[in-house]
Curated annotation (Swiss-Prot):
Pfam assignment, any one: DUF1967
Organism of this sequence: Pseudothermotoga lettingae (strain ATCC BAA-301 / DSM 14385 / NBRC 107922 / TMO)
SUPFAM superfamilies: Obg GTP-binding protein C-terminal domain, Obg GTP-binding protein N-terminal domain, P-loop containing nucleoside triphosphate hydrolases
Subunit structure of this chain's protein: Monomer.
PANTHER family: DEVELOPMENTALLY REGULATED GTP-BINDING PROTEIN-RELATED (PTHR11702), MITOCHONDRIAL RIBOSOME-ASSOCIATED GTPASE 2 (PTHR11702:SF31)
Protein name as catalogued: GTPase Obg
Compartments where found: Cytoplasm
Residue span, OBG-type G domain: 163-334
Domain Obg: 4-162
Name of the gene this protein is made from: obg
Family listed: Belongs to the TRAFAC class OBG-HflX-like GTPase superfamily. OBG GTPase family.
UniProt: Mg(2+) binding residues: 176, 196
Gene Ontology annotations for the cellular component aspect, listed alphabetically: cytoplasm
Amino acid sequence: MQKEDFVDRVTIFVKAGDGGNGAVSFRREKYVPKGGPDGGDGGDGGFVILRANPGLSTLLNFKYQRRFIAQNGQHGKGKKQSGKSGEDLVIDVPVGTIVKDANTGEVLADLDRSWMMVCVARGGKGGRGNIHFATSVFRAPRIAEKGDKGEERWLELELKLLADAGLIGFPNVGKSSLISAMSNARPKIADYPFTTLVPNLGVVKIDENSEFVLADIPGLIERASEGAGLGNLFLRHIERCSVLVHVIDISGSEGRDFIKDYDVIVQELCKYNEQLSRKPQIIVANKIDLLEKDELEKRLETLEKHANQKIYPVSALLRINIDILKQKIFEIVGKSRLLLQKQPVPVFEKPKPIRTKIEERFDFEIKKTQDGFEICGEQIDKWLSRYSLEQKDALERFLDTLERNGLSEKLKQMGAHDGDTVWIGQYSFEYKE
């Protein structure tokens, strides 16, 4: 995979569909001259859902499209016909994608299972038609609800690759050669630092029925946890690995001290995330073909005592001991998979559409302006978003509600006089004592 094709962090905008408006309608049939209300409800707005697709390995698609908007619900019609709900917008992301609210940083989901889904924006509830407002004394209501607005938000998507095992170590210790020797991956290999600029994934076959995914992480250097070199751009990709394969150039062919290299990488892992240092590690001494037998045994013994664990000597170039290493990695990966299988797979439950709660009793603010008075408040905004004041009955209901909450008395206290203009949203009214 080329550097420009690997994208592992993006910010996108999502908006769910708005609910459709309810209808004001009455039966109009030949032999029913005074038919009752039959206005249908508006359809619900479509939801925005993210889905983990195992066929994807990068967030590259989001580099070119960053705005995603679901369908609105259709408006209700006469004859009790409800509007069609908007279709949900399902957006595929790679398995291993972490979803965050871009404004708050809150983690909304960790899509670490194939086909796992999460709703990131709920559609608005469709408004009710006038059929719902009929009573024994209010038989011809000319009032219906507007649909609720769908949710909208900015999201940050962060990809953490889902590999079973991750190769870590300094640049030029032979990680790319090792993944090439062990798997079907064919990374670029050269004798200069940072040949690997993006993580490479390879499938390692054990037999016809057994395999695991191995990731070659770009070389780490001292202060990588602080951003040095390729730094922590890629350190997060090993957080999900079951086992870390720490590759060391035992030959010192690059003039490096293999003991110091081991210590630096261990320290950088601990600085970045202490949990990484607790993961199972396999220490691989690569390039054994460049040393004489006696010198090799001496260095392996020194490293084993220092690390206090078994060392696996290999030559990626000559494929020496590669099968032994593959079996050891698979042994640890298999144990991790058994633990994962015992965990229940999350079941996606679609939430209910957004429904704004409107209160009958509420406070509001009155502001004195150059041309009159302005009525404002959270519940005022909610009423205006729910009802169209151009509908006669909706207007009367709204004004009656304001009156019950002390509108006239408060205006009088503010010094209002006959003929003053009172603004409520985009609507203006004439004040009368």
